[in-house]
Amino acid sequence: MESKMKVLKLFRTLHRTRQCVFQNDHRALEAARQRINEEFKKNKRECSPAKISELLKFGTDVEILLRTSVVQGIHKDSDTLVLQARKDLLLDNIPFCDAPEKQT
């Protein structure tokens, strides 16, 4: 019963993340909705606890990747694209960080 609750929670979380990440982009919202629903339906009859755990981990990783990596761009002119950064967007650029390294 606990795994059913985790699956349902992940399902809801993925849909909430989809709505946040693809806000006002109806084509992307619909495509993401269909893909999420399709993947959950495909694995609906899974009974193996190990496989369920693996799928939950994969779904959680996908949610984190969507939330922290996807940037939405909006066309303003024919040659202008404005990027909308969300608060959850991962902005670290570690390999090119300007801060000096601390010596130990």
Curated annotation (Swiss-Prot):
In Gene Ontology terms, what is one molecular function of this protein? Answer: protein folding chaperone
InterPro entries, per the entry: Complex1_LYR_dom (IPR008011), Complex1_LYR_LYRM7 (IPR045298), MZM1/LYRM7 (IPR050435)
Q: Which UniProt keywords apply?
A: Chaperone, Coiled coil, Mitochondrion
Q: Which GO terms describe its biological process?
A: mitochondrial respiratory chain complex III assembly
Where does this polypeptide localize? Mitochondrion matrix
Top-rank taxon of the source lineage equals Eukaryota
Residue stretches in coiled coil: 21-48
Gene Ontology cellular-component terms listed: mitochondrial matrix
Similarity comment text for this entry = Belongs to the complex I LYR family.
Self-association or partners: how does it assemble? Interacts with UQCRFS1.
Explain the purpose of this protein.
Assembly factor required for Rieske Fe-S protein UQCRFS1 incorporation into the cytochrome b-c1 (CIII) complex. Functions as a chaperone, binding to this subunit within the mitochondrial matrix and stabilizing it prior to its translocation and insertion into the late CIII dimeric intermediate within the mitochondrial inner membrane.
Report what the protein is called: Complex III assembly factor LYRM7
What phylogenetic lineage does the species belong to? Eukaryota, Metazoa, Chordata, Craniata, Vertebrata
